[in-house]
């Protein structure tokens, strides 16, 4: 699957335990998507457009109103990256 650099970064942060919080306006449309890493840092590459592409491809999902997390398909799509911890 073709995944852009920004989508790859977001998926990698989610695969390591991060989550995406969304804020909706009065009409129920998503206007802000915030990616939070496991350590609590905010990922600047996660925009609403990136969020919509990941959700459209079913690489992320929300369960029972909780924040969005990576799915099994997302784990298979993400490329391995060296972890500099």
From Swiss-Prot:
Entries under Pfam families matching the protein: YjhX_toxin
Similarity comment text for this entry: Belongs to the UPF0386 family.
Coiled coil regions in record: none
Organism this protein belongs to: Parvibaculum lavamentivorans (strain DS-1 / DSM 13023 / NCIMB 13966)
Protein name: UPF0386 protein Plav_1374
Matches recorded under HAMAP family: UPF0386
Superkingdom as given in the UniProt entry: Bacteria
InterPro entries, per database record: YjhX_toxin
